[in-house]
Amino acid sequence: IDKRLIKEKKYALYKPMGFDGVQFHDDDVVPGIDDLTPAQITKQCAKVKKMLDNNGLTPEFVAPRLWFAPQTVDGGYTANSAKDRRYALDRTLRTIDVAREIGCGAIVLWLAREGSYIRESKNARIAYQRILETINAMLAHDKDIEIWIEPKPNEPTDAAYVPTIGHAVALAYASSDPKRVKGLIETAHALLAGLDASDEMAFALAHDKLGSVHLNDQNGLKYDQDKNFGTANLRGAFNQVRVLEEAGYGSKGEFIGLDVKAMRTQKGKGVTSHLTGSREIFMHLVEKVRTWDRKLEQQMIDARDYEALELAVMKHIMGVR
């Protein structure tokens, strides 16, 4: 079977579903990237770029997949082994080159195994310094690339470094070029940290540090579920859309990303239902946010009638009077 043909058929699905962009891991673009020469990588990137162009799709970002390789079992950038840290950095710089080859201007750092299961196994202070050094090396490697840090508090490590957007923003300000370092907020990751996703987004937006979002949902403090957006907490989803809309998110070309997984193995058209369903919920919530009575809201705020405000919000979301 021609794998390139399979990939092109997959890309052909996106536009009809209403999606304009694609998010990649480096080895999605270049399978077996560790074993290829720069010339081979460039050749493969050209093939992928052509497929994207043929289907009118924009590559939003590329992320280095650093949690599968044996060199990253204890983290890449924060590994105790200098050799393993070198591998992680080399792979990351190569990912920047891949992004550039396919016409992409952003790299996402989901720090995955950068953390520990046992606190005493790493020096956390030095680990954070090493993450910052990595970010600065990335910025130096390409003078235009943006770096979007995706926080997560746990999984696959018990205690991950950079668990919240506050940590990511702090690293951005400490970097050699703060304007090019931002965050990517995933709903479920914020919830797993015990935080409100809309407040995390608001914090990043207040600092002009929201590069992108991964909208999904999470049913309690357990493994990262990547549930369809709004299916566990519809009001929470409404508030995420409300915060993004109020800040004008998207007006500078930012994407709304969905990081959702199918409930189970599917065949045929069912393989994309989680994507179309989440998009539909999102679009309905955009309409709910845009039709919300702001004058009524302000009246209730001025009167400090928060019971009435909460009821009005819920009735609006439910579509009842």
Model-derived regions, located:
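Active-site-proximal loop/turn and secondary-structure-junction residues that shape catalytic pockets
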Residues: 26-30, 63-68, 111-115, 151-155, ...
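Active-site acidic/histidine proton-transfer and metal-coordination neighborhood
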Residues: 45-47, 53-55, 59-61, 69-182, ...
